[in-house]
């Protein structure tokens, strides 16, 4: 997959775990594909396919991330799971049944979700949890 032109990866999004960072890149790429489809006025099947791919990958990523935090014995995992559910619900709300059929979000609504929920989550939550895990591991090594 090509890097997203609409939502390019920036070094400030880096969590510090290559696997999680790669998954975050993929989320941005999928969001970029959906944005292009919606902005170009593509047909229902193309937009629905792009939307379904983003939802599926978001859910898979959140599950993988939660397993990682659980395996690392992060005390923040329950709070993180709740945030993941909220973000997923907000993503799902970008597609809804209107009186005349299925309605998808506007490009601006999608951009808002990506920038204010998804990317903000990378920076504010994921980086913080990973930082606390690595600092905790360093403290354990120095006290041993």
Model-assigned labels for residue ranges:
Residues 1-144:
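Small-residue-biased structural context
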